[in-house]
Amino acid sequence: MTYSSDTVTPTTLGTGTTEARLNTDSPIQVPDGISNIVSAIPYFVPVGVFTPDESYLVRVRMQSNDISVEPCRFMMSGVNTGDAAFTSVQAPILQEYSMNIPNANGANMNIYGQCLTTNTAAPFLGCELVYSTGSTGSQQYWNTPDSISTGGTTINTRTTLNTITITDGREITSIGMVVTPTTAAASTHDVGEAEFTSSDFQVPFPYKFPIAPSFSGLGAAANQLTNPNGLSRQKFPAGHGIPLAPRALINSFYTNRDAKGVGSKVVPFLSFTR
């Protein structure tokens, strides 16, 4: 088995929240001889100034008219800025999202990006696809809620987030959450726990884990530096995930462990097999 990879042309997502197709609004064609899309690795390409109190919070969607892909919507790592004349922005590591999409030979893939918050300076987004000539495991499907949620302002507030529905799922293979500040302020941090529950889980166990924390410094120009991971994700080995009912409604929650002047933006996401 041989591996290969290709990238799309980085494309602007605009300053609003409208979904944009990458590769300058064109599909990327999988090469002949490739049978499997192993994974996707999206990446930010900032080309303008970052703006105070404007974080990057972006969802990626993959679609094809040639092969079965959807649902395939997942969250990128968040990127935080700071307050007033902040001096630096920290880039998170690249995240790889397992796909294992079969029958990909010659298929046209459409890759979309969507900012879930507005930005004064439009971010650009690129994406790498990793290919193989053989199977690399069960196909992974991804989903998020349709819209973002806002966390609490009072310390220790447990916020109910928007739900995710899975149809014809066999097991959840990962659960994750992205939290980015709406407004950065000195000595005000994003810390806390994510929690996933459902009466459609076929096991009675808890699924709770810490978010990727980010901390703010002192002064009016406080930076709230991005966590190196940019998101928090719990992965389960194949065959050892969360077993599901044929149709499952997934609830999620975020508990903020520090007071916030303005609630942070929160988006859960997950992957599953069929």
Which stretches of residues belong to each language-model region?
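Beta-strand-centric surfaces of beta-sandwich/beta-rich domains
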Residues: 1-274
